[in-house]
Amino acid sequence: MGSREDGSPAPDFADQVQLAFDNLENVLKAAGASFDDIIDVTTFHTDPDAQFETVLAAKARAFPQKPYPNWTAVGVNWLAGFDFEIKVIVRLAD
């Protein structure tokens, strides 16, 4: 989720997306992983048509070169006050 330190959503969609990717990066680092270790991404969007360009820009920053992870985008009606959520599957080394 693109939540701020207090757990609330950023009011701007682009900020929510950036915070979600920043939060994800922090979780990956804590696990000894990086964006290169992600093999599957699922994102949830409250208005996919209006939001997709912003998400694609964040995707390009996070995954600048091949191989890209599998990516599924899902339109939803409600995300508990948020407009974007990201879920990933990560491959960790033994």
Please state what every model-predicted region is:
Residues 1-94:
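Short, polar/acidic, helix-capping and beta-turn segments at strand->helix junctions
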